[in-house]
Amino acid sequence: MTDIHAQDLAARYIALWSEPDAELRRRAIEELWAEGGAHILQPPQEIREIAAGLGFDSTTLQAHGYDELDVRVTRSYERFVAPGQFTFQARDGAVRLHDVVKLNWEMVPVGGGEAVGGGLEVLVLDENGRITTDYMFPGI
């Protein structure tokens, strides 16, 4: 497997979610993920409860392939970063064990201050160091 430093990967991964340029975001997606890679999101508890109340058996949200990943990242950017109040940053302490990288991230005010959101990310990598599966667990 390619020699990937966990904290470097964490920084590149999190920077993607705050990238304002759509072409650079798409390029980063194609560089970070393997073709056909997946992003699997466990929504916050309140959303899971609402979905369960509506009769949904599974409340896991998924995006597969570059096009769906592009939509997912772009929507997150538009909702949280584009208005200009917040940005995402990787926290220190990313670790790698074989083909898995665990990292924590946070959403912070652009001018600095306490984190207002964050979560845990578990990235499964292929032999070239690209993401095959990205498990996201938001919530501090």
Per-region residue spans from a language model:
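C-terminal and inter-domain tail/linker signature
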Residues: 1-140
